Amino acid sequence: MSSMSIKFKKLNNTIIKCKKCPRLFNFIKKISLEKRKQNINEKYWGKPVTGFGDVNAKLMIIGLAPAAHGGTRTGRAFTGDKSGDFLFKSLHKVNISNQDFSKNINDGLKLKSTYITNILKCVPPGDKPKNSELIKCSNYFINELDQLKKLKVIVALGKVAFDNCLKIYKKKFNMNKKFEFKHGKKYLLPDKRILIACYHPSPRNVNTKVVTPLMINSLFKKAKKFSTL
């Protein structure tokens, strides 16, 4: 095990045990007890959800927070929900993942030089986090950015993830520049990494064709090229 993976293991253990935000802690416990009808016989993860993937990643994919009955249930980001289904079909198509599905933590999924995480490690009620919760959780995301020494490209899924990623960068680097969220648009960050805006592969966006498989595939092909995967 490399020293970097040891650091990640320590970070992830800290994240899993985190109880900094009582509102979020209580909400994920409530979800895990009440469950969803189709998952009533499953044991929910019911804790903060860490990032996963290659610790030597050149590409990072970020969302805002785990899904209530996706990551919060399975214990892995973009796993066991429709957004994840759509995302991994695309990642497999462009040879970033070894399979086109992400069902549970034991499904054999592997990522090629890619790390997937959320800015907020717990699902917030109504998918709307408080600013204080984002601030408390931001150090975990900063730690992930710092640990991924080879990281070159960040793809932000959705405007909220994009905006909050920039908030963290603005705080860290004292940035004043304005960044517009536009699908496929890329920006150079102060640490020389590239940030790419991407529509979120939510069921609503997919069903209304705001985002299509072709659009996502094309974007990740570009992300691979920029990160030289």
Show where each model-derived region lies.
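A polyanion-binding, active-site-adjacent surface
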Residues: 5-229
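Cysteine-centered metal-binding/redox modules
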Residues: 1
